[in-house]
């Protein structure tokens, strides 16, 4: 059988569903998004017949992705949402050359927010829900390339699965493996396991493809003092932290406070790793988070910290995006949460665009794919106020499966001319898109993109990717929780109540 995964073609190549990254409860799709998925499914069947292909063969082609995105355009336009769209010619639904032109590219893609966890047996051990566990995770589908070979029968989320989903099933060239906010003892991915994943990639001659963060939560005793040891032992490329984190549930902390923020920044400076990545926006699950979760996820401290520490690069993970409020154009005001709180903080502290603050897109872009008009506002605001050289690519995968659909959607996304004229948003040109995909993040991570691309072009991972794509068999699956019940099971699994 040609396809081991989804042989009937029931799954769309652009995965717009309720899946989350486990940090917040799934939210239902809007009517227009449900209509978009339904129309895309109908068009896939019709276009497959016109092309003389099976439904699955059609959907795994670039025409299948183009057909899906074109259906999304049609459904959203019918709902009056025309501020953003996927810029694809109609012919791409049936003409492979047109689809390839629209959906493929040679950009350097550097995903600075990747996740996996250690083998599930150990992770599940403390939980009373071991018997049911993450029953929604399609572990039986993780026999990717060769069921009898090195890549066969791996568990979802492990290092091998991460390497396959990230580097074989997507166009990602480099990635950063990051962490979730827990105490060190409860981390679902420890520093040594992250380093082991990097070694797995390097064993495939994939040196330089995977970097790792050092997790530091300054209000946990000992975390700041461990930073030098972490850097020396694991060669961390940046620090990852969470201002919502709380050891007692009472309060978080701020980047500009003297008790926690200032010591963290100084210790980062002392290690020589002057890059601090801060989760902002998306609410996080209790009990490890403060009760004022959304408040401490706001960005009012970012501008102050950036102004006081011009030698430090602050990368705002998720760009401060808050899922509870629909984004529109920015207007100055008392913004305490959301993307607008980031912009307001920069403006109040005279931080001009393209300074030492970066806006990262992990989960944010994936969530915005539901609503291209909201996407136009969020992307437009970030590019206008944070800067065209300071918006950086991240996907939060592999919670969302392979990030290839996020890449294809962003490759074709455009802000409508009417929005550009009315709000001063820039056109997303191929050159700007390439900067967001990888060039912008190369500065804080101290990469020479030319040297990296030259090396990556001929390593074993590149050769394996080329061979695999002669007969690709993507799963089109997502792995994070998709319903509230799954989300609650997931929290219990991690020891949350």
Model-derived regions, located:
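Hydrophobic faces of well-ordered beta-strands that scaffold small-molecule active sites
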Residues: 110-114, 175-177, 212-214, 239-241, ...
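Catalytic pocket-lining loop regions of alpha/beta-barrel enzymes
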Residues: 251-393, 401, 418-429, 475-496
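N-terminal secretory signal peptides
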Residues: 1-53
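Mid-to-C-terminal alpha-helical segments outside catalytic/metal-binding sites
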Residues: 53-70, 95-102, 108, 123-124, ...
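Divalent metal-dependent hydrolysis catalytic cores, especially in the metallo-beta-lactamase
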Residues: 115, 132-155, 164-186, 209-215, ...
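Active-site gating/metal-coordination segments in enzymes
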Residues: 90, 174, 179-297
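N-terminal twin-arginine translocation
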Residues: 41, 45-60, 68-96
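Conserved, mostly hydrophobic/aromatic
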Residues: 113, 239, 359, 396, ...
């Amino acid at each position: 059988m040609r396809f081991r995964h989804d042989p009937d073609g029931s799954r769309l190549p652009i995965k717009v569903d309720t899946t989350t990254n486990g940090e917040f409860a799934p939210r239902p799709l809007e009517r227009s998004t449900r209509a978009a998925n339904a129309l895309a499914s109908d068009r896939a069947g019709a276009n497959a017949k016109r092309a003389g292909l099976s439904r699955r063969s059609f959907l795994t082609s670039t025409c299948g992705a183009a057909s899906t995105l074109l259906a999304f355009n049609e459904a959203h336009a019918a709902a009056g949402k025309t501020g953003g769209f996927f810029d694809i010619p109609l012919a791409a639904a049936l003409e492979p050359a047109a689809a390839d032109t629209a959906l493929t590219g040679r950009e350097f893609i550097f995903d600075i927010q990747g996740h996996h966890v250690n083998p599930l047996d150990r992770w599940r051990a403390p939980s009373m829900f071991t018997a049911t566990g993450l029953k929604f995770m399609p572990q039986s589908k993780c026999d990717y390339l060769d069921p009898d070979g090195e890549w066969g029968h791996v568990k979802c989320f492990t290092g091998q699965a991460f390497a396959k989903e990230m580097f074989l099933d997507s166009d990602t060239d480099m990635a950063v493996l990051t962490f979730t906010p827990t105490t060190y003892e409860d981390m679902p991915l420890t520093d040594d396991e992250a380093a082991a994943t990097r070694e797995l990639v390097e064993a495939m001659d994939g040196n330089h493809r995977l970097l790792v963060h050092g997790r530091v939560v300054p209000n946990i005793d000992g975390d700041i003092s461990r930073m030098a040891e972490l850097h020396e032992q694991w060669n961390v490329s940046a620090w990852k932290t969470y201002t919502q984190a709380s050891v007692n549930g009472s309060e978080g902390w701020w980047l500009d406070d003297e008790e926690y923020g200032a010591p963290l920044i100084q210790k980062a400076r002392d290690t020589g790793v002057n890059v601090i990545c801060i989760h902002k926006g998306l609410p996080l699950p209790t009990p490890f988070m403060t009760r004022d979760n959304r408040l401490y996820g706001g960005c009012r401290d970012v501008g102050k910290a950036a102004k006081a520490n011009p030698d430090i690069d602050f990368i705002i993970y998720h760009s401060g995006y808050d899922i509870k409020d629909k984004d529109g154009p920015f207007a100055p005001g008392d913004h305490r949460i959301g993307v607008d709180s980031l912009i307001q903080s920069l403006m109040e502290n005279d931080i001009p665009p393209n300074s030492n603050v970066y806006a990262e897109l992990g989960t944010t872009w994936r969530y915005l794919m539901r609503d291209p008009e909201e996407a136009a506002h969020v992307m437009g605001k970030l590019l206008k106020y944070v800067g065209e050289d300071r918006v950086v690519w991240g996907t939060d995968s592999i919670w969302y499966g392979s990030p290839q659909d996020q890449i294809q959607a962003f490759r074709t996304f455009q802000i409508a001319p009417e929005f550009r004229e009315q709000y001063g948003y820039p056109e997303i040109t191929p050159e700007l898109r390439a900067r967001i995909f990888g060039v912008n993040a190369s500065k804080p991570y101290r990469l020479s993109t030319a040297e990296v691309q030259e090396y990556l072009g001929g390593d074993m991972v590149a050769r394996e990717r080329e061979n695999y794509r002669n007969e690709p068999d993507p799963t089109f699956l997502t792995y994070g929780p998709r319903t509230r019940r799954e989300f609650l099971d997931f929290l219990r699994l991690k020891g949350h109540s």
